């Protein structure tokens, strides 16, 4: 299993359009902003999973590998840029990556799988208070058994985070 994961990650690195970001990270592994940009690039690649443009059945391994790489990059960005906007952004993107992971699992296996993914969120990983308040306001404004339409990904992720990981 470890060999398979290593080969998958190696394949992602070799085929990635983010080679310049990998070069920056290899030159200075403590470059927090480079890790953040790398994570954002992999998060975008994982979000492309939802387009389902391929005529064959889409495999979730590719999306999960991209999300794992994004999580790894965001963890590094937060670690090497402690106390900065880069670290704050990295923490928000880590929660966003969990939301994308839950979305992939929801498409593949239903709402129970998405809920389990949200429950695997580390306890110490939280959205900033302003985004938690946004999600709470959206959820409280929605009637019981109502349908919540959001204006964008920020609203959606904040609402999903509070609904599924915090149980609101």
Predicted regions and their residues:
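Hydrophobic alpha-helical targeting segments used for export or membrane insertion
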Residues: 1-15
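Amphipathic alpha-helical repeat scaffolds of TPR domains
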Residues: 26-58, 65, 72-76, 87-112
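Acidic/histidine-rich, surface-exposed loop or edge segments in extracytoplasmic proteins
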Residues: 51-56, 116-119, 141
């Amino acid at each position: 299993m470890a060999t398979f994961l290593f080969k998958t990650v190696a394949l992602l690195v070799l085929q990635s359009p983010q080679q310049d970001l990998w070069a920056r990270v290899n030159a200075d592994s403590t470059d927090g902003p480079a890790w953040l940009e790398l994570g954002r690039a992999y998060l975008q690649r994982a979000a492309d999973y939802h387009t389902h443009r391929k005529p064959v059945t889409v495999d979730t391994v590719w999306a999960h590998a991209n999300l794992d790489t994004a999580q790894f990059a965001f963890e590094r960005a937060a670690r090497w840029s402690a106390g900065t906007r880069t670290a704050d952004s990295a923490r928000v993107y880590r929660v966003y990556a969990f939301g994308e992971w839950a979305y992939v699992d929801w498409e593949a296996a239903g709402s129970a799988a998405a809920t389990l993914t949200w429950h695997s969120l580390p306890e110490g990983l939280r959205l900033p208070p302003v985004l938690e308040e946004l999600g709470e306001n959206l959820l409280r404004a929605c009637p019981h058994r109502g349908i919540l339409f959001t204006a964008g990904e920020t609203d959606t992720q904040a609402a999903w985070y509070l609904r599924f990981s915090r149980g609101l």
